[in-house]
Amino acid sequence: MASQTPGTEAQSQTVQPGRIAAISLHTSPLDQPGTGDAGGMNVYIVEVAKRLAERGIAVDIFTRATSFEQPPEVELAPGVTVRNIAAGPYGTLDKTALINYLCPFVHGMLRAEAEHLGGSYDLVHTHYWLSGQAGWPVAREWGVPLVHSMHTMARVKNMSLAEGDTPEPEERVRGEDALVALADRLIANTDDEAAQLINYYGASPSRVSTVFPGVDLTTFTPGSRAESLRRLGLPEDTILLLFVGRVQRLKAPDVLLRAAARLLELNPSLRDRLVVAVVGGQSGTGYREPWLLSDLADSLGIADLVRLEPPCPRAELVHYYRAATVTVVPSHSESFGLVAVESQACGTPVVAARVGGLPTAVRDGVSGVLIDGHDPHDYANVLHRMITEPRWRERMGAAGIHHASGLSWESTVDGLLAAYRDALHQCRLTVPCR
């Protein structure tokens, strides 16, 4: 899945990193996904780091400390260490404020590396633009390649903003432009993201690798729907529409609520069995308090059907997926769509917006349905068919299991290692690195 620079594949196979510095400045890999700024990127970093360590590659993940009670080092897994770097005041800061604390963060990283007895780093992999701003001076100081994953891009997000949402600042756009110029290797989650890097940011195709994210196929598996419904305290005949993710305008949980209200207009007989579950916490602009979503449900006349649930560990989340009739992912922007893949791995079809990486995460018409735009009426029509045509829905569920089986984290790491080897090889040819 990872692209290779022509003519370098054979040579790059002999170069292997022994120790990697990953940077996730604005959100800790120890945070619960679905809360604050923690989401699919956090899952990505943790799952990749664990599997790299299983292959003998040590990974240190640098993040900003948010409490004086946090120790400088936390072992996340054998071979994976989270390093909490003091930079700026403790507590949660808005991402727009973090740019002011890049210098102390960089200083903290350099000091941590200088004091560490385990040897130097072979490569720096940064996640999100803020991490990249801290990562490129560190990589240059150490003389190692910089690999960067955007995860989301300002220009792309600004082209698909939800109504009332705040555009990404020009400062971020300029920062991403700089990273495209400075990084030795850019990792795209999908072919669509790779094209965006090339077309909107002028990235050289030879320095872009497409590596699909994965899913934990040992946790997210098919199981008894009846048992999962019982665990959630729901009757066996429940029609469960599921949303998983941070409660923010970008993720568009309001579209699901409006679609559910429209669904009942189409078929009022569904009301006694319908439940809409929103599993996730507050984040980002808009929806400053979860109760605002409750107000919307009340205004739509479906407050009695909506369950607002806090983010939960994967061992619990899997039961929501198994119990769901369909998982709805109506995002305005999505770099990949991990929730959609997790749902399919559990055998539950997906109805999603045709944006970003979701056409890769969901096989339209096979494992789910992709919808152009965010009109609740369009979602309601598809959901009604999903509910009233169980055989169609079951075929999609089975196809989703097959589709997700090809998106393992092991395959992701295979692709990343190919990109790492290529970056290391190119770096050796052009010492000092770019």
Curated annotation (Swiss-Prot):
GO terms for molecular function: acetylglucosaminyltransferase activity; D-inositol-3-phosphate glycosyltransferase activity; magnesium ion binding. 1D-myo-inositol 3-phosphate binds at residues 26, 37-42, 95, 128, 152, 172. It is an enzyme of class 2 (transferase). It holds the Pfam family Glycos_transf_1. It catalyses: 1D-myo-inositol 3-phosphate + UDP-N-acetyl-alpha-D-glucosamine = 1D-myo-inositol 2-acetamido-2-deoxy-alpha-D-glucopyranoside 3-phosphate + UDP + H(+). Keywords: Glycosyltransferase, Magnesium, Metal-binding, Transferase. Its EC number is 2.4.1.250. InterPro entries: Glyco_trans_1, Glyco_trans_4-like_N, Glycosyltransferase_grp1, Mycothiol_biosynthesis_MshA. The keyword Lyase does not apply. The keyword Magnesium applies. Transmembrane segments: none annotated. UDP-N-acetyl-alpha-D-glucosamine binds at residues 32-33, 40, 246, 251, 334, 342. GO terms for biological process: mycothiol biosynthetic process. Mg(2+) binds at residues 321-322, 324, 348. Catalyzes the transfer of a N-acetyl-glucosamine moiety to 1D-myo-inositol 3-phosphate to produce 1D-myo-inositol 2-acetamido-2-deoxy-glucopyranoside 3-phosphate in the mycothiol biosynthesis pathway. Homodimer. Belongs to the glycosyltransferase group 1 family. MshA subfamily. This is D-inositol 3-phosphate glycosyltransferase. It comes from Thermobifida fusca (strain YX).
